[in-house]
Amino acid sequence: MVFKRLLGALGVGGPTVDTVLDPAPARPGGTLTGQVRLQGGNADFEIEHITLELVARVEAEHEGGESEGAVAFERFTVGGGFRLAEGEQREVPFSVTLPWETPITELHGQGLGIVLGVRTELSVAGAKDKGDLDQLNVAPLPAQEAVLEALGGLGFGFRSADLEYGRIGGTGQRLPFYQEIELLPSPRYAQQVNEIELTFLANPGGMEVVLEADKRGGFLSPGHDALTRFNVSHEGVEHQDWPAIVEGWIGQLVEHRASYGPPAGYGSPMGHGSPAAFGQGGHGHGHDGHHHDGHRSGPGMGTAVAAGAAGLAVGVVGGMVAGEVVDEVGDFFEGEEEEEG
């Protein structure tokens, strides 16, 4: 869907702008392509700059609770320096590179409830107007998809996803926010953790995988959080045994046997080396859990996302029907623009 607006800063008779993104979803660190379509007004106008701004709906925690707001996390100048004649139609194609930490919004075409938008700013004769917004769809990188599919195969279920304002200490995070994907524990770990939160922090060479467990308390001990971090390469993803790798990560997280020495293996208790993934000790609060033998296979995370949590209708993600995400983008950012005005 394309959101089309008349340039308010120029009033009636000014040029109009549509930004149309190419239909295929983009990927973190990948190329976003499309066209900015301009329609001339009732006079000639000097188009100084055409700027695209990537904006996300982000949650922030503070003393008063939680609030949501729009955070712009990248800007690109894609055109300008020309005269748009009266009534002229012109297309300005663009190709820009997304930040590596751009959140993913879907898995196998199923929305995760993350709201990202591309907002167009036109600078005309000294006036600027943020005139057009389009929904941005981002699919996972191969390594991200492999981790999610492995978690689904191990019996973990999708609960929700959101963007949190702030930084994760000890990581190479660059954006002012990070994505949290909340997972329901598999039956094997249901007695030990309430949920597991997953964060991907991608970079040109690979990505950091941050796992946090909300661990259940015992009869005499309170519950607490445990955190571990692992590094994964973009190379050789298709040659790895991801269920075994991820199961090793979960074992370290739940048992809290993270090693603070040099990276060894991919994080499993056996410590087998792998060029595509290696475990790295993270931070957490020490508490030994109980390891249960056995392995549960099941549908991949794509199926789990499509089905949603047990008892919820198919397609309901984070309290919002996936098909309504487009409207949510428009409503949310229009509200932000009214506040800015």
Language model features with spans:
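Short beta-strand elements
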Residues: S123-G155
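Short, low-complexity, glycine-enriched hydrophobic/amphipathic alpha-helices that associate
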Residues: H287-E339
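Extended serine/threonine-enriched, polar tracts that run as long, contiguous segments within proteins
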Residues: G153-P222
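Short aromatic-acidic-glycine turn motif
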Residues: V55-E68, R216-P222
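A eukaryote-biased signal for short, well-structured alpha-helical docking elements
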Residues: M1-V12
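Internal, hydrophobic beta-strand segments that form the core of beta-sheet-rich folds
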Residues: E53-V58, S95-E101, H108-A127
